[in-house]
């Protein structure tokens, strides 16, 4: 109607997109994030910054205190899986956020005739800033060498791909990667994990153009060396993270507006504190 497809029509025309947009079901310590992921996916696919997403962010990421309230309820992937002795191999898809849970669930379902079943699904948190170099350490420590990194959604997100190419490409990448891993690991207990997610909404909004900081990850992070003369003040726009090395302070964007320049059109991003950047899936398959 009015140029729009019904869900049934979408299922017939583009089933992978239908399953990506399906309802997010997982074990989560704060269930609003599941509804948020569904709203995020709609905004991403329609390429519009919706009021639903905006209102969630203005409420849940109003400032660093509100952000801490919900993010502190979630454990990291390493914490959730550190006591597990039953996982035989890990698939790490760089940049795979919790928004991908329904789509991967469907791919596993398609392999049920081969004996694969999705046993458990959890939502975990990445560490802030949501960068690969900060979060990959835990993944490597957790997997004990039983790790395959494949289907990189991160690297390609930093290239400009015209809408809707990035939606189409990433669906294809996740399907091929998951299918290949299942086929190559018959009879094994598998955990699909990630280091951080990706947001495709920051490209739709302006940047705050904060002065005196070094831009990192297209302004999702502003870097302040401790020896810098730039003073760091509290602000509702970002969370202040002092790194353990005591050499750097990072300002991490709480909202979709980046802290420095605007994220280029057609580009995904991470580093900040939005739920799609921060929350990652743990999917246990046997």
Where are these regions (language model features)?
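Feature captures the catalytic ectodomains and active-site-proximal regions of enzymes
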Residues: 1-286
């Amino acid at each position: 109607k009015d140029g729009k497809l019904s869900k049934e029509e979408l299922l017939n025309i583009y089933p992978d997109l239908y399953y990506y947009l399906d309802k997010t079901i997982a074990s989560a310590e704060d269930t609003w994030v599941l509804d948020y992921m569904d709203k995020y996916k709609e905004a991403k696919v329609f390429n519009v910054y919706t009021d639903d997403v905006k209102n969630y962010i203005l409420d849940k990421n109003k400032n660093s205190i509100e952000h801490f309230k919900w993010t502190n309820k979630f454990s990291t992937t390493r914490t959730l899986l550190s006591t597990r002795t039953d996982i035989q191999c890990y698939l790490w898809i760089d940049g795979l956020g919790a928004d991908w849970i329904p789509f991967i669930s469907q791919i596993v379902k398609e392999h049920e005739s081969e004996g694969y079943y999705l046993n458990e699904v959890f939502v975990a948190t990445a560490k802030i800033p949501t960068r690969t170099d900060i979060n990959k350490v835990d993944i490597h420590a957790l997997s004990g060498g039983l790790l395959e990194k494949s289907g990189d959604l991160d690297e390609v997100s930093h290239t400009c791909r015209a809408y809707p190419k990035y939606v189409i490409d990433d669906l294809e990448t996740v399907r091929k990667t998951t299918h290949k891993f299942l086929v190559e690991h018959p009879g094994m207990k598998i955990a699909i994990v990630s280091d951080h997610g990706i947001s495709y909404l920051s490209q739709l909004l302006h940047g705050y153009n904060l002065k005196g900081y070094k831009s990192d990850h297209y302004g999702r992070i502003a870097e302040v060396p401790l020896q810098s003369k730039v003073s760091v003040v509290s602000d509702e726009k970002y969370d202040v993270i002092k790194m353990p090395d005591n050499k750097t302070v990072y300002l991490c964007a709480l909202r979709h507006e980046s802290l420095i320049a605007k994220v280029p059109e057609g580009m995904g991003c991470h580093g900040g504190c939005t739920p799609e950047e921060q929350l990652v899936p743990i999917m246990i398959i046997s």
